[in-house]
Amino acid sequence: MLEKSFVPADHENALYDAWEKSGAFRAHPDQPGEPFSIMFPPPNVTGTLHLGHSLNFVLQDMLIRWKRQEGFNVLWQPGTDHAGIATQMVVERALDKEGTSRTALGREGFLERVWDWKQEYGGTIVKQLRKLGASADWERERFTMDDGLSRAVRKVFVTLYNEGLIYRDRRLVNWDPKFRSAISDLEVENHETKGSMWYIRYPLEDGRTITVATTRPETMLGDVAVAVHPEDERYADMIGKTVILPLTGRRIPVVADLHSDPEKGTGAVKITPAHDFNDFEVGKRHDLPAPTVLDETACLWIEEIRPELRDVEGLASVAFVETLNGLSREEGRKQVVAELERLEWLEKIEPHKLQVPHAERGGAIVEPRLTLQWYCDAKTLSGPAVEAVESGKIAFEPRQWENTFHAWMRDIQPWCISRQLWWGHRIPAWYGADGKVYVAENEQDAQVQAGEGVSLTQDEDVLDTWFSSALWPFTTLGWPDRTEELARYYPTSVLVTGFDIIFFWVARMMMMGLHFMDDVPFRTVLIHGLVRDEKGQKMSKSKGNGLDPLDLVAEFGADATRLAICAGTGPGRDIKLGRKRVEEHRAFVTKLWNAARFLEMNGAKPTEDFDPASVKSALGRWILTEANDAITEAGRALSVYRFDEYASCCYRFVWSRFCDWFVEFSKPVFAAENEETAELRAVSAHVLGLILRLMQPVIPFVTATLWQELGYPGKFEEIRWPEIMTVTRADEARAELDWVIRLIGDVRTVRSEMNIPPSQKAPLLLRDAAPENLERAKTWAEAIGRMARVSDVGVVGEDAPRNAAQLVLDEATVFIPLEGLIDLDAERARLAKEITRIEGEILKVTRKLDNADFVARAKPEVVEENHDRLATFQSDLERLKAALGRLA
């Protein structure tokens, strides 16, 4: 006997452990079956589960579970990412609390501590994913720095280097002065900041001045030119002239370049190639030098400009510039501005809002910095990836993301793959005393290249975390070895990921997969949105609207959490999720449990010899027909990644068709104990089994519990996706039950609109009903009476009864006499008053939405909320007017 209620905590852990021990999630590359494989987007080893992870992994798990049911040979490859800078930061913080540091330990000692930390805490997110029900093949779990992947990374690096696709170059990078390392664009967050725009006059040699506007006066020490637009008439005769740079006395040219915008500032801009990405490009176009004036800690540094410093009375002072050396950029800025003001070269200061780049990890202000780094020729590697998308070898879902992919790929830059960290894949390059580089998979091979007696020192840098991640689809399957798994599961079937890493990860996996495997890494890229709160706002700690998925699992169960995520996931849109949504979906789980319990109490038991084609009763044939529709629609929805439509289809069939109608219609039959009773018991048990199989991908715990407890045959984790059944006279059964359901539903609506008390039964009169519908009303009189609170069903001629509400159902007019049930005059007055109130609300909201100023200034979620309110009010108004019309 089923328990009174389903308590997820009583079942989830035991079920999951049993599945894992039985090998239910294990891949079998040596067995038949069409392969279907998905690779984990490897979460950071430092990570803990958040709602973004939950969305991503629930969608993957649903596809994996569904494909297992369909008989595919499935691999869901799990693993975690070493997360270079994130992990190093976590361990450095721990060391700081202990009163020591990375440098105090030394490289080897520090790396030992990181591995210890990984061993102790690195499995947290994996354990949490198990709590969510993720059915990955955990025995195959990989780590981006395990021995096999490390060997593969070294081989890829050496191969690309030998092909000329990896090289060293001096270029601008995003520099984190706290970690003293280059970082990727994805690790940079722009914060809007209130700052200043300084207008500084630069004197020309001929005595004139040109005013430049800048937000970074301290970097003027590294200026190498002033740029103006070639068509800006104000400066036409200055192009080619020489400017004497204030403070330093250095001579720099005025150049013509399209980078300058005549409409912004003064139209003249200072060019500092070593400290601005746009200026770097201007410098290349004009063959300008690029002196660095900020060191690795973002302090002023004058070594590269010192030889050119000179004193110019009233303009420049070598002694002053020397005092700036070693100052922080902020203090240096103050000193530079003060000196310019003292010398009267500062024209004015204006308040200015600007986007300041901050490091995602640690929060330091990021600097563009010119450094010698290792680069990968992404432009060359990108060609086959672009062709793969254009030819349809790889499809994006939704298709709109292909445009984003192409936009990024059109402007692809060399990929900086080196990082000045200790935790990560150390670059397999060694240097002789003369600086000559030897690239090899190990030091022994490098020594062979260098020759005996040459002392070698390995490069101190490590590879960008995204480099090893780009190899994930094939290295996790054993490459460079020719493994059974690699032959069976590559290319993978679908990649599920967020839009923010299409370039950083997705595109790079395409490049590497095509280059080393000569095939795409996946056939489909499924892009999902972000998880937002119920009002559509981004979740954040500062807003206090964040949700911990494990808290949701603990309170509502993994099934309810998964179902809420699934139901909210539509193509190309963010998902709104809150506690209320999850609670609503827990109600669904409860509804399913209660229905199963009711059927069990009424003798419904699964039978292996049940034949749907032999069912005689209209009710039985109808629910089997509805089940066929649900199976078809659910399968179609999953096949096109419409998780929201899958959830909606299941919800509609289970909650409405099965629980609200079929179970309710069945109650008197179960009580009667006749031939139809036995048939309906068999039908209900069979359909419940179909529901459990249909919904296993999204709510695996409650479905598995019911399958086991109710005695369905076979292991639940091995069951197949339900097949379409043969149902005799299906259309006839559908027409009959649909008519009865619409009649009951319409009568319920009228009763609600008329405020008829539930305790008061009302007669029902039909006029002009077709003979088959009169027969249906007679056959289903008990159900109509019980479910629509109807005292009896009769027929009326041409004379309509007075004071009756009326509705139209197909060819028939249905009357509900109201005399004695309600105070008709009072009800008319109530409806009229409510109509007036609703019309007033509609007017207020309409005025607000018609106000262009409101729409422009209000937050998008506020505008959306008002549109929703307007739609609700308009719906209410239609309903109220219909009710009043029925009383007229």
Swiss-Prot record:
Monomer. A motif ('HIGH' region) lies at residues 43-53. HAMAP family: Val_tRNA_synth_type1. Keywords: Aminoacyl-tRNA synthetase, ATP-binding, Coiled coil, Cytoplasm, Ligase, Nucleotide-binding, Protein biosynthesis. One of its GO terms (molecular function) is ATP binding. Pfam families: Anticodon_1 (PF08264), tRNA-synt_1 (PF00133), Val_tRNA-synt_C (PF10458). This is Valine--tRNA ligase. It catalyses: tRNA(Val) + L-valine + ATP = L-valyl-tRNA(Val) + AMP + diphosphate. It comes from the Bacteria. The keyword Transmembrane helix does not apply. GO terms for biological process: valyl-tRNA aminoacylation. Catalyzes the attachment of valine to tRNA(Val). As ValRS can inadvertently accommodate and process structurally similar amino acids such as threonine, to avoid such errors, it has a 'posttransfer' editing activity that hydrolyzes mischarged Thr-tRNA(Val) in a tRNA-dependent manner. Disulfide bonds: none annotated. InterPro entries: aa-tRNA-synth_I_CS, aa-tRNA-synth_Ia, Anticodon_Ia_Val, M/V/L/I-tRNA-synth_anticd-bd, Rossmann-like_a/b/a_fold, tRNA-bd_arm, tRNAsynth_Ia_anticodon-bd, Val-tRNA_synth_C_sf. A motif ('KMSKS' region) lies at residues 538-542. ValRS has two distinct active sites: one for aminoacylation and one for editing. The misactivated threonine is translocated from the active site to the editing site. The C-terminal coiled-coil domain is crucial for aminoacylation activity. SUPFAM superfamilies: Anticodon-binding domain of a subclass of class I aminoacyl-tRNA synthetases, Nucleotidylyl transferase, tRNA-binding arm, ValRS/IleRS/LeuRS editing domain. ATP binds at K541.
